[in-house]
A protein has these predicted regions:
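Extracellular beta-strand elements of beta-rich domains used
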Residues: 24, 130, 154, 170-174
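Extracellular carbohydrate recognition
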Residues: 146-149, 159-175, 181-184
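Extracellular ligand-binding interfaces
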Residues: 59-142, 162-167
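Aromatic-lined, polymer-binding surfaces characteristic
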Residues: 231-519
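Extended polysaccharide-engagement surfaces of secreted carbohydrate-active enzymes
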Residues: 466-632
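Sec-dependent N-terminal signal peptides
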Residues: 4-13
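Short carbohydrate-recognition loop motifs
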Residues: 43-66
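Extracellular carbohydrate-recognition regions
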Residues: 18-38
Length: 632
């Protein structure tokens, strides 16, 4: 076994995040892995998550186990208990074992100190990430949180009642810092059970998957009119989503496939290629989930528009590769943080390939994948007003959820899914409490604990598209949601000098023009909301026309302009007067074509958003900043 020293300082200060990583590339099993009972361990090239080899475990009887007596790295990780020290590895299962699980036991000599189970209801690779502080104390109830104890041994026990089987282990280390956003999944549903931020939303896919609809299918009888609306909306959305062929997207897919080296062995069926990780784990040369989305969309587009059969084969190759690598139903991939941003193209790709997937008897599997990674299960239940980061959900997940719902073939099930999403949407367009994400009573929109127009603009753009799709149906926005959303849009029209807002509310990108103004693609939201009710809302329509003049117009925008002009609606005059946004600690004074933005901060609203690589010197951007903006 080759031991990779992640940090030169591991032996000096013991502060490296990963310590020593087992990678098995030299074909040798370390002497610390021993006491193999009722089975064998070997180094295999069948499957690998790092390099070309992994540790293969074949057990031949119940009660099989092996131990890891690592008196250097296990104590190293436990010393970082308060920093979320723990275990990280990837496990490959060639065969799903529903209802069965591995048992991990950490000991101090002969005394069991920590334990956890790893469910084996999967095939392919799955991440096993858990901090010692989230493990279980033998003999104690679930609500007892572990304390730091000395440990020096790990025992891995085969699943009870399974007489023989095979598993593979790779990318294994005893870590001094398990990501605080380690994602609960089907393998360890409570691997982050003492998370203090109850509002965290990226890591809730598996939790949502346990939700049930309040409407039983047998009791749900959609009307003929509702089904007709559903069919028409499905066609409308599908036409808009598929758009036109993009040769650059197609070429990009082929280029990425070649670079990824993804291949299927014609004899064993095993799939090989560069390893796939989410951005938080991905290193140079690895494949990311966005790469998978890019490849699937390009090949789907080539097949759908050009009838290219080899593109269909490549699509299936990438699809199977993704599943094999752990980009699958029920998987958390270690941490899936911000998954909505890298998962937006897959629904479109899968929908394009529907007929082909059905011909391969893979449609149900693909649809399940789309429904899971879009979080469609969340709106099975009413909106929870205390869930956070709502703008991210609107922006990255809302339309994929609609697509996933409309892909359902059974019309009653499709109706239930769209109805649930509609009710959840109406519930989410509300005044959210405190500083959590969402719209506030003064029309500001919070993200990351403060008013954040850049995120709001993008989220509102998606809500506008959604409103356009459901307009005129029984799934449309209700009066309350429409009124609150209008208030937020009109507030944006007043704190923007045409499209641009003040530097004090630019967050961590104060000097990037694309992050400090309403993007052209989001302007149509004003128009779509204007026509969402029974009559055209002249306030929204006239402000759309005012902002439209400064935008790079699309066909849809031009059509909305013609519609409003035909109704005699003229562009709005610039806002006048003083506008107070107490939730944002902001004031805006408008006069003619100019605007003054005043920004402060307080104990509830931060003065600047500073990341390690963003806005390092932006501390004072809200310290009573006064900015004069001209005509935009």
């Amino acid at each position: 076994m080759k031991k990779i020293f992640i940090s030169f300082f591991v032996f000096i200060f013991s502060v490296s995040v990963y310590g020593i990583q087992y990678d098995f590339e030299d074909g040798v099993i370390p002497t610390t892995i021993n006491d193999i009972q009722k089975g064998t361990l070997s180094v295999s090239s069948d499957h690998a998550k790092m390099g070309t080899k992994s540790l293969r475990w074949d057990w031949t009887a119940t009660g099989a186990l092996f131990r890891v007596n690592d008196e250097v790295n296990i104590p190293y990780a436990i010393k970082a208990f308060s920093n979320r020290g723990g275990l990280r590895m990837w496990i490959y299962s060639p065969k799903a074992m529903p209802g069965k699980s591995l048992q991990f036991i950490f000991r101090n000599k002969t005394v069991r100190v920590y334990t956890f189970d790893f469910n084996l209801n999967f095939t392919g690779w799955r991440a096993c990430w858990i901090a010692f502080s989230d493990m279980w104390v033998p003999g104690e109830s679930d609500d007892v949180q572990p304390t730091q104890q000395d440990i020096d041994e790990l025992t891995i026990k085969a699943p009870e009642g399974v007489e023989s089987g095979t598993l593979y282990f790779d990318r294994w280390d005893f870590s001094s810092n398990i990501n605080k956003q380690a994602t609960p999944d089907a393998q360890i549903p409570k691997n982050n059970r003492f998370l203090t931020r109850d509002f965290w939303h990226w890591g809730r896919l598996w939790e949502w998957e346990q939700f049930s609809y309040s409407d039983e299918l047998k009791d749900l009888v959609p009307t003929t009119s509702e089904l007709a609306e559903l069919r028409e909306m499905t066609t409308t959305v599908q036409t808009a989503l598929f758009g036109k062929v993009n040769n650059t997207t197609i070429a990009n897919a082929s280029s990425k496939l070649s670079a990824a080296g993804i291949k299927r062995d014609v004899y064993t069926g095993f799939i090989s290629g560069k390893p796939l990780y989410t951005d938080q784990e991905k290193e140079s040369g690895d494949i990311g989930c966005q790469d998978v989305n890019d490849m699937m969309l390009g090949f789907a587009m080539d097949y759908y528009f050009n009838g290219n059969s080899s593109a269909a084969e490549n699509f299936m190759l990438v699809f199977d590769y993704a599943l094999d690598q752990g980009y699958a139903y029920g998987s958390g991939m270690g941490t899936n943080h911000h998954f909505g941003y890298f998962n937006r193209d897959m629904p479109k790709a899968v929908w394009m390939m529907k007929d082909y997937l059905k011909s391969e008897s893979r449609w149900d599997e693909a649809l399940q994948l789309i429904q899971y990674w879009s979080g469609l299960a969340e709106p099975r239940q009413p909106y929870d007003i205390n869930r956070d980061e709502l703008l991210d959900t609107w922006y990255t997940l809302h339309l994929p959820r609609l697509y996933a719902a409309l892909m359902i073939e059974d019309e009653t099930e499709r109706f239930r899914a769209v109805k649930g999403l509609s009710e959840w949407t109406n519930g989410s367009i509300c005044y959210t409490p405190g500083t959590i994400g969402g719209i506030k009573p003064d029309g500001t929109a919070f993200h990351h604990g403060a008013h954040y127009p850049d995120y709001a603009s993008s989220a509102f753009g998606i809500l506008g598209d959604y409103a356009n799709y459901v307009n005129g149906t029984s799934f449309t926005l209700d009066a309350s949601a429409r009124a609150i959303l209008k208030q937020a849009f009109m507030a944006m029209a007043s704190y923007c000098n045409v499209k641009e807002w003040g530097i004090g509310v630019c967050g961590r990108h104060p000097f990037n023009p694309n992050e400090c103004s309403i993007k052209s693609k989001n302007i149509n939201a004003f128009a779509y909301l204007a026509v969402d009710g029974e009559t055209v809302d002249k306030d929204l329509a006239s402000n759309f026309l005012r902002i439209y003049e400064t935008a790079t117009a699309t066909t849809a925008m031009n059509n909305m302009k013609k519609k409003f002009t035909a109704l005699g609606i003229e562009k709005a005059d610039p806002m006048q007067g003083f506008f107070t946004y107490n939730h944002a600690a902001q004031g805006v004074f408008r006069g003619g074509e100019w605007m003054v933005s005043l920004k402060g901060f307080n104990r509830y609203v931060w003065g600047a958003e500073i990341y390690y690589s963003n806005n390092r010197y932006g501390r004072y951007q809200s310290y009573s900043s006064i900015q004069i903006l001209d005509s935009g």
